[in-house]
C-alpha cells in the first residue's frame, strides 16, 4: 500500500554510514574545519539508507533529512544536538561541525533515527594503527572505510593479509601492530563502550527535551572489520545493549 506523500518528517542522526560515505554520489566539500556535508542533508544519494527509508515512506527531500556526519563520534553528537556546533575540533577524527540548523531539524521531526558508536572505537584504532606503522597504513584505512573488509569470509581475510603485506613494515612496526591487534585494540574497545553508552543516553535525553513527541529509533552500529575479535565483541555489545 502506497503511503500518503510527506505524511511525516524523518530525520536521521549518525556518522559516515548514515551519510552514505562509500557511495560514489555523496557530495561534500573540504573546509578549514574538515568537511562540509550540509549539501548531503537533502542531496544525499538515493542508495543510502535514508534515501531508501524516504522512498518507502513516500517522503521528499524536505521530509527525509540526512544529518549523517563523517568522522563524528558520540561525544561530538552530544554537543551537536544541543547547539548544532562543536566547541572545538575533534583532534582524533580531524573534524569540527557547525550546523545550527541541527536543532531546528530535530524539533520538526516526527521520527528520528540515531546511528552512532562505530567511530568511538574505529577512529582511535585508525590513529593507533597509523602511529604503530609510522602512517604507512593510510591505504589500509581507506580499504576499511570503503567497506571491503566487512565480510567474514576467506576472501576477506586474504584481502586483509594482502593489504598488510603491502605496508612493507619494519620489524619494530610489525611488533607494534601485533601488540595493537592482540592487546591495544581490546583496551580501545573497553574504553569506548562505556563512553559511547553514556553519550547515547545523553543524546536521547536531549532529543526528547527538544521534541518530546518524536519517535526515536536506535540503529545498531556497523562493524567495519568483523575478522577482528575485539571489534566484533564491541559492536555486538553496542548494537544490542
What are these model-predicted stretches?
Residues 241:
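Conserved small/polar residues in nucleotide/adenosyl-binding loops
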Residues 1-9, 91-112, 202-213:
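Short amphipathic alpha-helices and their capping/turn segments at secondary-structure boundaries
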Residues 52-62, 199-218:
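A structural motif corresponding to the C-terminal end of an alpha-helix
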Residues 26-194, 198:
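Conserved SGNH/GDSL esterase-like catalytic core that processes O-acyl groups on lipids
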Residues 9-14, 18-19, 64-68, 111-115, ...:
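Structural recognition of the beta-strand scaffold that forms the well-ordered cores
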Residues 19, 73, 225:
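Flexible, glycine-rich phosphate/dinucleotide-binding loops
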Residues 20-26:
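Short glycine/serine- and acidic-residue-enriched loop/turn motifs that recur at repeat junctions
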Residues 215-236:
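Conserved, well-ordered alpha-helix/loop/beta-strand core segments that scaffold catalytic motifs
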Amino acid at each position: 500500500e502506497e503511503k500518503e506523500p510527506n505524511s511525516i518528517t524523518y530525520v536521521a542522526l549518525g556518522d559516515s554510514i548514515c551519510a552514505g560515505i562509500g557511495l560514489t554520489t555523496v557530495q561534500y566539500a573540504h573546509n578549514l574545519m574538515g568537511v562540509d556535508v550540509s549539501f548531503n542533508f537533502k542531496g544525499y544519494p538515493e542508495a543510502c539508507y535514508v534515501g531508501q527509508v524516504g522512498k518507502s515512506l513516500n517522503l521528499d527531500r524536505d521530509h527525509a533529512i540526512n544529518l549523517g556526519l563523517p568522522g563524528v563520534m558520540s561525544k561530538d553528537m552530544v554537543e551537536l544536538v544541543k547547539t548544532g556546533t562543536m566547541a572545538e575540533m575533534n583532534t582524533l577524527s580531524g573534524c569540527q561541525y557547525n550546523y545550527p540548523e541541527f536543532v531546528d531539524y530535530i524539533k520538526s521531526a516526527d521520527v528520528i533515527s540515531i546511528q552512532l558508536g562505530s567511530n568511538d572505537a574505529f577512529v582511535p584504532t585508525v590513529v593507533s594503527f597509523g602511529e604503530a606503522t609510522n602512517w604507512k597504513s593510510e591505504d589500509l584505512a581507506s580499504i576499511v572505510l570503503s567497506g571491503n573488509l566487512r565480510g567474514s569470509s576467506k576472501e576477506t581475510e586474504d584481502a586483509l593479509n594482502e593489504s598488510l603485506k603491502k605496508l612493507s613494515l619494519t620489524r619494530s612496526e610489525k611488533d607494534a601492530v601485533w601488540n595493537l591487534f592482540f592487546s591495544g585494540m581490546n583496551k580501545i574497545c573497553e574504553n569506548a563502550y562505556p563512553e559511547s553508552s553514556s553519550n547515547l543516553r545523553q543524546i536521547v535525553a536531549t532529543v526528547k527535551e527538544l521534541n518530546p513527541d518524536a519517535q526515536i529509533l536506535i540503529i545498531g552500529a556497523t562493524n567495519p572489520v568483523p575478522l577482528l575479535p575485539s571489534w566484533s565483541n564491541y559492536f555486538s555489545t553496542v548494537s544490542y545493549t
